[in-house]
């Protein structure tokens, strides 16, 4: 379900997702933001457990020259979910997606900022459970002052993060890759 309000050149669209609907509103919003990004795409999510389609979209955005950056927590709340999240880093990092871990604490923010012009913020994580199994609410913003606030927030977050892109862009040992493949079998369940 989506509702919108327009004030001057500002737009705010509220969307809600639920597991009973065949429409995957949050996933579609994220995929559209990724597809239309031209310069920058900044994402924060506590859990990065994405579909092949989402992974492909992020990798293609980076390949076409978009500065794609993803912030995940460096301090986990769930160790298995943390390990699964990290299993996605290599595939993304090798294609130019920059990965950051927030180390001062647990970052639970769920936001996506596209070219500093349009943003989504709300309760939807970049994971299977949020996108397919939970009731979620998000807001899509365009032309609002809040977008500038989000951009400044990202600047602060990046300064507090450790970039781990290089560590994961070179690949990993066979045992770690096998372990990550096993963990990914359970990704839709966590």
PLM features: what roles do these ranges have?
Residues 14-22:
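Glycine-rich phosphate-binding "P-loop"
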Residues 10, 37-42, 47-190:
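PLD/PLD-like phosphodiesterase catalytic module centered on the HKD motif
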Residues 1-13:
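Single conserved hydrophobic/aromatic residue that forms the stacking wall/gate
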Residues 27-30, 126:
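A generic local structural motif
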Residues 22-25, 32:
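Conserved catalytic alpha/beta core of Sir2/sirtuin-type deacylases, generalized to analogous enzyme cores
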Residues 5, 33-36:
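Structural alpha-helical scaffold elements that stabilize or flank donor/cofactor-binding regions
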């Amino acid at each position: 379900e989506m509702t919108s309000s327009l004030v001057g050149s500002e737009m705010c669209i509220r969307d809600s997702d639920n597991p009973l609907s065949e429409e995957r509103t949050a996933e579609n919003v994220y995929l559209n933001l990724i597809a239309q990004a031209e310069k920058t795409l900044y994402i924060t999510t506590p859990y990065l457990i994405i579909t092949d389609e989402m992974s492909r979209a992020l990798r293609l955005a980076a390949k076409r020259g978009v500065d794609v950056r993803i912030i995940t927590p460096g301090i986990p709340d769930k160790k298995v979910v943390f390990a699964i999240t990290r299993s996605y880093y290599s595939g993304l990092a090798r294609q130019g997606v920059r990965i950051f871990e927030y180390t001062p604490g647990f970052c639970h923010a769920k936001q996506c900022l596209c070219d500093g012009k349009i943003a989504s913020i709300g309760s939807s994580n970049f994971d299977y459970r949020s996108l397919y199994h939970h009731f979620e609410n998000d807001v899509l913003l365009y032309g609002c002052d809040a977008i500038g606030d989000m951009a400044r927030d990202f600047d602060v977050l990046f300064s507090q993060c450790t970039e781990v892109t290089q560590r994961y862009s070179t690949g990993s040992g066979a045992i770690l890759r096998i372990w990550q493949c096993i963990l990914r079998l359970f990704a839709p369940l966590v």
